[in-house]
């Protein structure tokens, strides 16, 4: 598909998409990895929400992989501390299957494996918004499920726990990152009201990539 440029800049296009999202969906949360794209997305969404919907709280979902960059965890710590009274925070530290190339014998590694606590590479974060095996409210979670499934099932649980109303997970995905992401956004079989950057996951659960055309 040939790119077609318009006279609108990506920031104004993002604002337009946010108006659409907040109008169409009852429950909104941001998937925040602690990386630059999801960090930019989170701050842009919060700025929009504070300006146009000051009485509405959004959710922030962080999927902790235990063995991740120290500066990433530090950034997540600072961000969550700043948002503690401004957003619904979900810092998920549950056992999940992640593919590994570090072993010749095992296909998966399990962050936060509750039967191997002595092998954890860092201590469990200690905050009231941290979700682990001792306090897990996510009813759609299955023990040691794949990491991708955990993220999807969190979205489903978020809808269930918020009155089963229409829910959207905002992603910092950019089409420019790779051909796979480019085609994944532009060639979606099922969009939402003609918008290719929104995709259906489950009944009344969607994902949206409002920064998809950012460079």
Language-model region placement:
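Nucleotide-activated chemistry modules centered on ATP-dependent adenylation/adenylyltransferase
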Residues: 1-31, 36-215
